[in-house]
């Protein structure tokens, strides 16, 4: 294999307010807990089921950390891109412990706030921790790959129509 890719993309909701920790050297890290849920209908009973996964996120990018600290709150919907990293540490009894988390570092990460203005949307850091930008609107994208709503898409193709609300349909296979 010529190379490998370590990229994580999550769209979910914060389970609590961001936790900010400062280092002695003046740097800081912002920790998030993001919930993603999947729903399905049990074939045997017809009952709707749901499973929620909790993801630990550590933001080391200074600009993205500032946006998260100022604007994100419990319940905020966010889109993040980062890398999966596992770190080793020792608990109070000296036992080795491992934590796997999504890490947002400078030049390799992204954070976009989704949802309405009441949730603080409209701010985001671009690729490479590129500061702070106003994305506007309650949803940033109409359809996958069609570009920002109300703006020019990256390609020459026109953007698609509105969202389809047929997520309750069963998969046809």
Curated annotation (Swiss-Prot):
Residues of the signal peptide: none
GO biological process, one term: DNA replication
Domain SSB: residue ranges: 5-111
PROSITE patterns: SSB
UniProt keyword terms in alphabetical order: DNA damage, DNA recombination, DNA repair, DNA replication, DNA-binding
Membrane-traversing stretches: none
Region (Disordered): 113-173
Motif Important for interaction with partner proteins, residue range(s) on this chain: 168-173
Family matches, as SUPFAM superfamilies: Nucleic acid-binding proteins (SSF50249)
GO cellular component, one term: nucleoid
Cited Gene3D superfamilies: Nucleic acid-binding proteins (2.40.50.140)
Function, in words: Plays an important role in DNA replication, recombination and repair. Binds to ssDNA and to an array of partner proteins to recruit them to their sites of action during DNA metabolism.
HAMAP family on file: SSB (MF_00984)
Subunit structure as annotated in this protein's UniProt entry: Homotetramer.
Identification of the protein by name: Single-stranded DNA-binding protein
